Amino acid sequence: GYDHLDIEYLKRAHITWTNCPGCNANSVGQYIHSCLLLLEKEKGYNLSKTTVGLVGVGHVGHAVIEAIRPLGVQILLNDPPQKEALRKAGKPHEFFLKMEELQEKCDIISFHTPLITKGPYPTFHLANKTFFNALKKQPIIINTSRGAVVDNTDVLQALKDGIIRDAIIDTWENEPNINQEL
């Protein structure tokens, strides 16, 4: 992502920049795959009986699907912007579920969204106190998207309160000044 760049400043300074959407997608897929294998080995998870919810199914989300499908996990998908685009195009979109369904059914919820602060589908602090309090199971939360998609203060409290089983954090809110307690 490039949410940390001051695009207007770069334009004024005549500095050219580019981004490469999806360039690390396969690496993230491999990372999630290895996390699931580690959960199986060290925590005794039976992956064939594990439901994984993916929030965000763009370049990275698709790579994660391809990487974890062979493990036998059930995969549930949530991506409101893609669902809306498919619906408007008259294409099948029913496989995208509401967040509430992931909160109810998933043993693991993994975030793969850009950081969006405005508009119809904001992702800033998408996983916050309200999100955690609505969980029906005690899932593991994985964040490999942008740090501020998961409110780090709230995920820490959810861990302390036993609302979530564990958290796998690959990207932190306020990097490099991360929450050391988390």
Regions found by a protein language model. Give the residues of each.
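Residues that form or flank phosphate/diphosphate-binding pockets in enzymes
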Residues: L5, S27, A63, V150, ...
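Phosphate/diphosphate ligand-binding glycine-rich loop within oxidoreductases
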Residues: G1-Y45
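Rossmann-like adenosine-cofactor binding region
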Residues: E84-E181
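Glycine-rich NAD(P)-binding loop of Rossmann-like domains
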Residues: C35-G72, G90
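Hydrophobic/aromatic ligand-binding patch that stacks against planar heteroaromatic rings
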Residues: Y9, A67, F131
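N-terminal Rossmann-fold cofactor-binding loop
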Residues: D79-P81
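Short beta-strand "acidic-cap" motif of Rossmann-like dinucleotide-binding folds
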Residues: I75-L77
